[in-house]
Amino acid sequence: MNVQIEESWKTHLQPEFEKDYFRTLTEFVKSEYSQYQIFPPGKLIFNAFNLCPFDKVKVVIIGQDPYHGPGQAHGLCFSVNDGVPFPPSLVNIFKEIKADIGTDAPTTGNLTRWAEQGVLLLNATLTVRAHQAGSHQNRGWEAFTDAAIRALAEEREHLVFILWGAYAQRKGAFIDRNKHLVLSSAHPSPLSAYNGFFGNKHFSRANDYLKANGETEIIW
């Protein structure tokens, strides 16, 4: 199957594209796009991979589902398009960055600039039906994104994996803590941010680790 995805990722994930679950997933996604409003736009499904080639990844942030409101999702977890109001979790992410490293919140919630520096902003599920959170869960995306995380965890070293909330922590449970830095805390959602997200200092801790391993820091 010829999947339109960045070449280095295509090389590493090619075995997934040939599996039965991925063929079934592809048919499901095509059917959904033909019948319903689906986010993100089709050409942006693999945006996280396309902006951040396999060998350029330094940090992985794991999300769950794309935003399901109009104009929000563009293939990067927690990120929204330019001009779109910041969702509550993103507001809290920027608050923690300010508290941690002193950087003021930007004027846009578009995190493409992180992706281009080597931050893989990966949702577990890459598509969603408009206004129906979780509507594309358990259709195969989770197996595919597990494979991407596993490839990075096994074939790269000294990466930072940022796992906010129980869902991301379960998804990253197999990552070798001796080979990578795994940062876990509560989710930035307003429901849980005060239970350990605020004050986690993940942004400075990620940069300290990158620097200690000879990598340039992320400009958060």
From Swiss-Prot:
Positions annotated as active site in the UniProt record: D65 (proton acceptor)
What Pfam families would the database entry show? UDG (PF03167)
Instruction: Mention one GO molecular function.
Output: uracil DNA N-glycosylase activity
Where is this gene product found? Cytoplasm
Q: Which SMART domains match?
A: UDG, UreE_C
Annotated CDD domains: UDG-F1-like (cd10027)
The reaction(s) annotated as catalysed by this protein in its Swiss-Prot or TrEMBL entry are: Hydrolyzes single-stranded DNA or mismatched double-stranded DNA and polynucleotides, releasing free uracil
Major place of localization?
cytoplasm
Asked if the record carries the keyword Cytoplasm, the reply is yes
Q: Is Cytoplasm there in the keyword field?
A: yes
GO BP annotations of the record are:
base-excision repair, AP site formation via deaminated base removal
Which UniProt keyword terms apply here? Cytoplasm, DNA damage, DNA repair, Hydrolase
Span of the secretion signal?
none
Q: Which InterPro entries match?
A: UDG_fam1 (IPR002043), Ura-DNA_Glyclase_AS (IPR018085), Uracil-DNA_glycosylase-like (IPR005122), Uracil-DNA_glycosylase-like_sf (IPR036895)
Record EC number: 3.2.2.27
Q: Would you tell me the Gene Ontology cellular component terms?
A: cytoplasm
Biological role? Excises uracil residues from the DNA which can arise as a result of misincorporation of dUMP residues by DNA polymerase or due to deamination of cytosine.
Q: Which family does it belong to?
A: Belongs to the uracil-DNA glycosylase (UDG) superfamily. UNG family.
Q: What is this protein called?
A: Uracil-DNA glycosylase
Source lineage: Bacteria, Pseudomonadati, Bacteroidota, Bacteroidia, Bacteroidales
What gene does the UniProt entry assign to this protein? ung
